[in-house]
Amino acid sequence: MNTATQPNCVIRIPAKDSYSTSGPTLMGRQSANEGFLTSWFRHSGHAEFWCMARFRDEAQVFARIGEHVHQGHKAKPVYRWIAQQQIHRIRSVGTLYAPGPQVADLAWMRRRNEQASATDFSIVGMTHTSCELSIQDGLANMLTAPVYPWDAQICPSVSVQTMVQRLLDDEAAWLREHLGATRVQSPPLPVLPLGVDCAALDLPAADKAQHRARWRQQWALSDRDVCVLYMGRLDLRTKANLLPMLDALQLAAQQLQAENGPRLHLVLAGWFASEWDETHLRAAVAQVCPDVRVVFEDGRTPEARQ
């Protein structure tokens, strides 16, 4: 294990867009990953940054992100690539970080490498969501993979941790019933909330006022109108059920109308996962909250995200 005063880690790059928000299929996990990697480059204080990727072009994406963060720095860091088939080289660093629940797969990769042993390095995964079936499979597989107490599966909140623990408990009960297992081991599930770089999102007061005025004009909002903003993927199955919000806004709109109050608007700034989602969400909005004016805005653009 690495005993340096500032422990380093190897960042796994599963795909070119794993740490980028510029792609067409933007998800919250990519935004979180981008923020984490940028902060790692900016604040870790290391002179060497390591990644593990299947291909050189994926490692080059990692290096380009680092070079962008370190523009203007006098001391230029070194960016190093470890190919997946050379996973044993992580021994010199001490920890492998994966931006998803990939601990089980990586533990098997560690075990199958003839030059690596289980105690050479820790594997740490991150669980951004627990709703998708593939994510649940990856988490459950930790119970039958060569995963040890020095590995970990990070949860960004207590609610996610509770969900993951319940899933593992159910899977462990099944293994005891079906296979007669007497010992089932799972890694720690530490809670580490996601950090937000507030300074990167902040704007001077004058710019804030200008942005606000421009958007309200674009959405045809009067000074008296009330606007509710939703920002995120518009996916009814794997992101969020918007029905409680739509119901509440319809009740609020009816009350405002009865009191001759301001008009209520809802801006859904996001992006649809599929045509099915778009068709059904638009129909649901029209049916559930007919007294609320709804505006759909593409939330993937830099202007909208700012």
Predicted stretch roles:
Residues S18, M231-T238, F272-A273, R300:
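Short donor-sugar binding/catalytic loops of nucleotide-sugar-dependent glycosyltransferases
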Residues E114-A118, R183, A205-C227, Q255-G261:
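Nucleotide-sugar donor-binding and catalytic loop/hinge architecture
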Residues M1-V93:
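N-terminal pre-catalytic "stem/leader" segment of glycosyltransferase-like enzymes
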Residues S222-K239, L246:
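Conserved donor-binding/catalytic core segment of Leloir-type glycosyltransferases
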Residues N260-F272, E278-Q306:
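Nucleotide-activated donor-binding/catalytic signature segment of Leloir-type glycosyltransferases, i.e.
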Residues A140-H211:
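A short, active-site helix/loop in glycosyltransferases that binds the activated sugar's phosphate group
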Residues M126-T127, P156, G195, Y230-L234, ...:
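Short hydrophobic "strand-cap" motifs at the C-terminus of beta-strands
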Residues D57-P146:
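Extended catalytic core of nucleotide-activated donor transferases of GT-like folds
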